[in-house]
């Protein structure tokens, strides 16, 4: 694949190289979410940070990342996916150096905010570049499965890798490891990725500012709500501002000559349904894993290290699910795989709602959660495939950005609501039961959406050209 050439169907070896290059960026972004969790205590003590301050080390990254994803997709459309991907990687690596060199909490939080900006730039572009490298829909689906497997492996191993790095070289090492990974990704991206020319259309600056404000205020309210109190003035103002900004964003989208999400995407039932399924998936997944990490320690008596060990098999099956999708994609439509996976997840979540009790053994919990997460591992690349097919080649950047934004907001909402459920429950077992019920409701709604909008289209062409 030539550096300046147009996108053509990838050869097998070149296609795998593209996959690895793009996965390196996702690897860094994913690791920096999971490894930070195990380093928070060391950061807090070394930099004399408050609990609220160290929380922002995690949440500040999510705030800028979620708020700027749509803008990242639009910039990739305007200036080219490869250009914005490389720019985002460079920003992320420099921000990692800033984090590692931090001498106080404010400097570390600033570095994390900038890391979120970099991730918001390169993550939408990576999906677009991967989609463009595989024009054959079956091959593209397989590559989405392999790509998701690499990312899932990073998520599963993140806490373990972070613990080893912190133990051997201090918390700074979890950021310094991004330097060699980022350098390899930058050099490889420049040499291997094809140049994707930008479009001459203007960037809807006002629309993006309103979208950023809506996502930013919503993210802030969800992040700060548990500590500040959901009825506190600052949280109520943030929610109100988010709603107002979202309404203005919709009005701007209707009237703008160059809307952020083209009207054809809004009207595409497959695209819209898959986007909402992405929200529901992360809502259930992150809410559930947040609950389990606390449940295993508070109700099960596990240490933080042992809780991580007990969660590992439940997380590792994501990789198996991703790889399984890559094999099943040749035989079944993405919508079929999504429906079966979501239906099974719903049944398991409702079963756990009934069974969870002090007498319920860990091994049964681990088996059921592993099957549920295996289904999620199948669903994620299937959902990505559906969205990229429905968006068409013209809109892959903004489609990928919208998917990532919806999933980030889903994760924030899921964790926030799960926290409220646990807080209001009389016991940890009651809280876990209601959390599983919430997950079952989300998975059932996702399965219904798949049945109505995706599975019914198996006999039609998989792609809807825009």
Curated annotation (Swiss-Prot):
Top-level lineage group: Bacteria
CDD domains: MFS_MMR_MDR_like
Keywords in alphabetical order: Antibiotic resistance, Cell membrane, Membrane, Transmembrane, Transmembrane helix, Transport
GO biological process: one example: response to antibiotic
GO MF annotations, alphabetized: transmembrane transporter activity
Transmembrane portions of the chain: 16-36, 56-76, 83-103, 113-133, 146-166, 168-188, 203-223, 234-254, 276-296, 305-325, 337-357, 367-387, 409-429, 434-454
Record-linked Pfam families: MFS_1
Locations listed in the record: Cell membrane
Keyword Membrane belongs to the record: yes
Gene Ontology CC entries for this record: membrane; plasma membrane
UniProt membrane topology term: Multi-pass membrane protein
Family assignment from sequence similarity: Belongs to the major facilitator superfamily. EmrB family.
Function of the molecule: Resistance to the epoxide antibiotic methylenomycin.
Protein name: Methylenomycin A resistance protein
Organism in which the protein naturally occurs: Bacillus subtilis (strain 168)
Species classification: Bacteria, Bacillati, Bacillota, Bacilli, Bacillales
């Amino acid at each position: 694949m030539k550096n300046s050439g147009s996108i053509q169907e990838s050869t097998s070896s070149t296609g795998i190289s593209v996959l690895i290059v793009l996965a390196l960026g996702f690897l860094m972004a994913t690791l920096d979410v999971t490894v930070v969790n195990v380093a928070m205590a060391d950061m807090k003590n070394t930099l004399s940070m408050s609990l609220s301050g160290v929380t922002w080390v995690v949440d500040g990254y999510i705030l800028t990342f979620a708020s700027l994803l749509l803008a990242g997709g639009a910039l990739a459309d305007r200036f080219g996916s490869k250009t914005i991907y490389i720019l985002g990687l460079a920003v992320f690596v420099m921000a990692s150096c800033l984090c590692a060199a931090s001498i106080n909490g404010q400097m570390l939080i600033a570095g994390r905010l900038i890391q979120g900006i970099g991730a918001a730039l390169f993550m939408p572009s990576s999906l677009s570049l991967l989609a463009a490298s595989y024009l054959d829909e079956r091959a593209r689906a397989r590559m989405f499965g392999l790509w998701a497997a690499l990312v899932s492996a990073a998520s599963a191993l993140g806490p373990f890798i972070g613990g080893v790095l912190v133990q051997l070289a201090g918390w700074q090492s979890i950021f310094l490891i991004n330097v060699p990974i980022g350098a390899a990704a930058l050099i490889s991206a420049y040499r291997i990725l094809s140049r994707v020319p930008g479009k001459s259309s203007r960037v809807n600056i006002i629309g993006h500012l309103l979208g950023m404000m809506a996502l930013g205020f919503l993210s802030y309210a969800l992040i700060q709500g548990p500590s500040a109190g959901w009825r506190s003035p600052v949280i109520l103002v943030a929610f109100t501002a988010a709603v107002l900004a979202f309404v203005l964003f919709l009005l701007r989208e209707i009237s703008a000559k160059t809307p952020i999400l083209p009207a054809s995407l809004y009207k595409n039932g497959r695209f819209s349904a898959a986007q909402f399924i992405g929200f529901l998936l992360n809502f259930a997944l992150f809410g559930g894993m947040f609950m389990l990490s606390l449940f295993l320690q508070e109700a099960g008596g596990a240490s933080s290290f042992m809780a991580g060990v007990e969660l590992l098999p439940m997380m590792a099956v994501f990789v198996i699910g991703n790889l399984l999708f890559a094999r099943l994609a040749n035989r079944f439509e993405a919508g079929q795989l999504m429906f079966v996976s979501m239906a099974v997840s719903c049944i398991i979540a409702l079963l756990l709602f009934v069974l969870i009790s002090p007498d319920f053994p860990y091994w049964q919990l681990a088996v059921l959660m592993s099957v549920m997460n295996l289904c999620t591992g199948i669903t994620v690349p299937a959902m990505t495939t559906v969205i990229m097919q429905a968006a068409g080649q013209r809109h892959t950047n903004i489609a990928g950005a919208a998917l990532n934004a919806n999933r980030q907001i889903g994760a924030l909402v899921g964790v926030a609501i799960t926290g409220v459920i646990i807080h209001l429950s009389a016991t940890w077992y009651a809280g876990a039961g209601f959390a599983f019920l919430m997950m079952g409701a989300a998975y059932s709604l996702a399965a219904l959406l798949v049945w109505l909008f995706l599975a019914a289209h198996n006999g039609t062409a998989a792609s809807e050209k825009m």
